[in-house]
């Protein structure tokens, strides 16, 4: 489902991308390649890997680390990290600053698995991603989005709101996720691109 219109006089489209890298991979590739879209800003929820990223905080991704083989299969990129457009991230930073919205910046983890089986290994998988790769939180799409943007010479970015945490028992309710995750939207809509 998608909507196209204007926001403060600028054309904008808002749509769902489905869940996971294959889904956003298809949508973003087609929008970039066949519909001449230049900028895609993913917004969504994430689970925090660190006490520094608390419920309702807004995260700006500076890299997406993944165990996915999406980029390797799609374009031969063997790296386990993809990057957003620095130009678009700069515009998001400026928008946040103008609106007084705090951004937490860093790498994120793009996982193929929502329900990973528990392990007795210490440190845990997510602790390794946090401690060795600087991942602040986990989501499921940005690695593929950034890979497509790089291959096609387009711009992509990701803003996330922390909905739950691996280091705290706190969790947002469904109603809070529907009604309170607005800072990331304000930052995305306020960017001048």
Predicted regions and their residues:
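Generic non-transmembrane alpha-helical segments
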Residues: 91-99, 148, 187-193
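His/Asp/Glu-rich mid-to-C-terminal helical/loop segments that flank catalytic regions of hydrolases
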Residues: 166-193
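Glycine-rich phosphate/pyrophosphate-binding loops
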Residues: 43-47, 152-167
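A C-terminal functional module that forms or caps the active site or interfaces directly
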Residues: 124-155
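Metabolite-binding pocket within alpha/beta catalytic cores that recognizes anionic/polar moieties
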Residues: 1-91
């Amino acid at each position: 489902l998608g909507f196209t219109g204007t926001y403060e006089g600028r054309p904008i489209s808002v749509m769902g991308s489905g869940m996971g890298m294959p889904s956003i991979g298809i949508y973003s590739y087609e929008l970039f390649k066949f519909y001449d879209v230049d900028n895609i800003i993913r917004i969504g929820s994430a689970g925090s890997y660190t006490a520094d990223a608390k419920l309702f905080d807004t995260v700006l991704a500076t890299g997406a680390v993944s165990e996915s083989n999406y980029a390797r299969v799609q374009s031969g990129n063997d790296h386990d990290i993809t990057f957003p457009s620095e130009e678009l991230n700069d515009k998001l930073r400026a928008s946040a600053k103008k609106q007084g919205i705090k951004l937490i910046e860093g790498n994120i983890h793009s996982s193929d698995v929502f329900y990973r089986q528990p392990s007795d290994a210490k440190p845990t998988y997510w602790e390794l991603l946090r401690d060795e790769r600087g991942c602040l939180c986990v989501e499921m799409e940005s690695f593929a989005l950034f890979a497509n943007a790089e291959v096609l010479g387009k711009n992509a970015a990701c803003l996330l709101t922390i909905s739950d945490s691996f280091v705290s028992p706190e969790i947002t309710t469904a109603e809070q996720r529907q009604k309170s995750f607005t800072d990331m939207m304000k930052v995305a809509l306020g960017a001048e691109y």
